[in-house]
Curated annotation (Swiss-Prot):
Gene3D superfamilies: 6.20.440.10, Aspartate Aminotransferase, domain 1, Type I PLP-dependent aspartate aminotransferase-like (Major domain)
UniProt-recorded name of the protein: Probable glycine dehydrogenase (decarboxylating) subunit 2
Cofactor (UniProt): pyridoxal 5'-phosphate
Organismal lineage: Bacteria, Bacillati, Bacillota, Bacilli, Bacillales
Listed SUPFAM superfamilies: PLP-dependent transferases
One term under GO cellular component: cytosol
Organism for this UniProt entry: Staphylococcus aureus (strain JH9)
Keyword Isomerase: no
Length: 490
């Protein structure tokens, strides 16, 4: 690996340098030893970087210029919905009455904030077809876990605590079985058929008296709509199980079909994906959960309700699984999502899904002559192609993904879902122009040609990035995860 990267902030540190200073205090101070027990006092000086303000600003400005995001390039990361985040969202989120409020203020002082929460709950109920919605969960997987804990409490409360199996398709997001495990369930895999949909015969085989639920994304991770969803619902419900909707792919079906109308009992949404909360940097996210009326009494508390002309917290929820997030979740993301929903309206959200589906099918059609397409039918918002043709020349999907970096394009999701060999999952979203799509398509086609005629160029990529190709074997055996490790290496 060759690095053209900047020094770490710790490497810029020089003893005695500082960014600012405070006047000498005339207040008598006490020693740390007089205030804390020995066990709480550091034995060694903390290694904070010591840098001047200008060095600090330049360091992080330089790093920010090297970041890649939706605002500076195409980001077709499958199943992540890396759409453009309208800047009006940021303007609303920075209104002082919102940005300077505190969750411990009296309800009377934050009526505007509570109204936003309540109104967003109502909008999401309409979009999903659910009867009640909580905004508390902080991310998609958190929403999955919350819904499964609601299912668990529901089954236990109905004398069916033995139901400890959750059915998960082989094309599902990896968070689905992980969330099931965290909620105390065992995952049972159901196979996909030759069309990439849930195999109904295999579903009938795995459903039994211990089935608590099935977790589905529709359209699924292959970008294929589960056309047999009503039959799936009947099979699972007849066995006493519940249906959970993973909202990761809701961007494909807004104002077209609702999870509630498909028979789902609970749904989580990703406000940071479908509803333009900025994401990709590790947070904050938001994963609201909606449920049918039979499960409403199990929702986390508090809920925000409207009482006359006022809004307030409601802690009187009979079977609540309890609080799942301090205060009431990530309020800043609620503001952005609510702004997006209100500015788009129902017609706009419908057009979003139509454009997302059109863009994905356009890319798929143009690439079909150059790559293996395992599932030929029309896709929804995303699709999966395979790099098996290029593998014949010694070039893998990983190599092509790294080569894309040289063209200023973020690679798609690769090797996922697991049931497609050399898979590359592409989700263009609705916000990209035809010119951008054509650039991406032409670039991938040129890389496919390179794989055939000049494979070393692809195998050695990337060539223009700050960090060249990683030595993955050494990185796995000798990871440098903190500054102390780096000092030891040097």
């Amino acid at each position: 690996m060759t690095s053209k990267s900047s020094p770490l902030i710790f490497e810029r540190s020089r003893e005695g340098r500082y960014a600012y200073s405070l006047p000498k205090s005339d207040i008598k101070t006490n020693s740390v030893e007089s205030l804390l027990d020995d066990k709480f006092i550091r034995k060694n000086k903390a290694e904070f970087p010591e840098v001047a303000e200008l060095d600090l600003v330049r360091h992080y400005t330089e790093l920010s210029n090297k970041n890649f995001g939706v605002d500076n390039g195409f980001y077709p990361l499958g199943s992540c919905t890396m759409k453009y985040n309208p800047k009006i969202n940021e303007k609303v989120a920075r209104i002082p009455g919102f940005s300077e409020s505190h969750p411990l203020q009296d309800e009377d002082q934050v009526q505007g904030s509570l109204e936003i929460i309540y109104s967003l709950q109502e909008e999401l109920k309409e979009i999903t077809g659910m009867d009640e919605v909580t905004l508390q969960p902080a991310a998609g997987a958190h929403g999955e876990w919350t819904a499964l804990m609601i299912f668990k409490a529901y089954h236990e409360n109905n004398g069916e605590g033995h139901r400890d199996e959750v059915i998960v398709p082989d094309s599902a997001h990896g968070t689905n079985p992980a969330s099931a495990s965290f909620a105390g369930f065992k995952s049972v895999t159901v196979k996909s058929n030759e069309r990439g949909e849930v195999d109904i015969d295999d579903l009938k085989r795995v459903v039994n008296e211990n089935t608590a639920a099935i977790m589905l994304t529709n359209p699924n991770t292959l970008g294929i709509f589960e056309k047999n969803i009503m039959e799936i619902r009947e099979i699972v419900h007849n066995a006493g199980g519940l249906l959970y909707y993973d909202g990761a792919n809701l961007n494909a079906i807004m104002d077209k079909v609702r999870p509630g109308d498909m028979g789902f009992d609970a749904v989580h949404l990703n406000l940071h994906k479908t509803f333009t909360g900025p994401h990709g940097g590790g947070g904050p996210g938001s994963g609201p959960v909606g449920v049918v009326k039979e499960l409403a009494s199990y929702l986390p508390k508090p809920m925000v309700i409207k009482d006359g002309d006022k809004f307030k917290y409601d802690n009187d929820i009979k079977n609540s699984i309890g609080r799942v997030k301090p205060f009431y979740g990530n309020f800043g993301i609620y503001l952005r999502a609510y702004t997006y929903i209100r500015t788009m309206g129902a017609t706009g959200l419908k057009e979003v899904s139509e454009a997302a589906v059109l863009n994905a099918n356009y890319i798929k059609a143009r690439l079909s002559e150059h790559f293996e397409i395992p599932y030929k039918q029309y896709c929804k918002h995303e699709f999966v192609l395979s790099g098996v043709r290029q593998k014949e020349f010694g070039v893998r999907t990983l190599d092509m993904a790294k080569r894309l970096l040289d063209f200023g394009v973020h690679p798609p999701t690769i090797y996922f879902p697991l049931n497609v060999e050399e898979g590359m999952m592409i989700e263009p979203t609705e916000t990209e122009s035809k010119e951008t799509l054509d650039y991406f398509i032409d670039t991938l086609i040129s890389i496919a040609e390179e794989a055939k005629n000049d494979p070393d160029k692809v195998l050695e990529a990337p060539h223009t990035t700050v960090i060249d190709r990683l030595d993955e074997a050494t990185a796995a055996r000798k990871p440098i995860l903190k500054f102390e490790n780096l000092k030891q290496e040097k």
